[in-house]
Amino acid sequence: MRSPEAVLKSLKSHSESLGYQYERLYRNLFNPAFYLLAYQQTYSKPGNMSPGVDGKTFDGMNHARVDKIINSMKNHSYCPNPARRTYIPKKNGKLRPLGIQSSDDKLVQQVMKMILESIYEDTFTDTSHGFRPNRSCQTALSQIKINFTGVRWFIEGDI
């Protein structure tokens, strides 16, 4: 199987061709190297050691677990686990619900994220900052500071 880096580079280059139609993207979910890369990108992030509803964490991730995920993808039996619900405090003193995914589901989501980002990232505008590579609240605020000179007020909302 091709390396994930080569696949992602190829997907990105095809995204530049207007009207290109991708075929069989699903087969990339059968590549164990994608899961290794996803594990490397996800393992060290804060909060990812929290056990999901299945009680498993990234500490217990191994090749056998990845093979099991891939086999369930191949025979179309993969089914994400329900999120474990917990509540975290908000600034206003209320609680916000937070869903904790299982580590297997986080891994699959990261693989899918890499694939979809390589295809669609270049289509987003420079003013879009949420959940994008090398973008954050800080980059959004920096852009506001540069482009919104003279603005006297903003409206804040909680969606």
Q: Which residue stretches match the model-derived regions?
A:
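Conserved catalytic palm subdomain of right-hand nucleotidyl-transferase polymerases, strongest
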Residues: 48-57, 99, 138-159
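Generic, well-ordered alpha-helical scaffold segments in large soluble proteins
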Residues: 7-10, 14, 72, 110-119, ...
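Non-catalytic, polymerase-adjacent accessory regions of viral genome-replication enzymes
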Residues: 1-67
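Basic, low-complexity intrinsically disordered segments
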Residues: 87, 123, 130-135, 140-143
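Conserved phosphate/pyrophosphate-binding and hydrolysis machinery centered on Walker-type P-loop NTPases
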Residues: 59, 101, 130, 134
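Extended, charge-enriched "interface" segments that sit outside catalytic cores
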Residues: 58, 82, 86
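Amphipathic alpha-helical blocks
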Residues: 60-80
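Conserved pre-motif C helix in the palm subdomain of viral-like polymerases
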Residues: 95-124
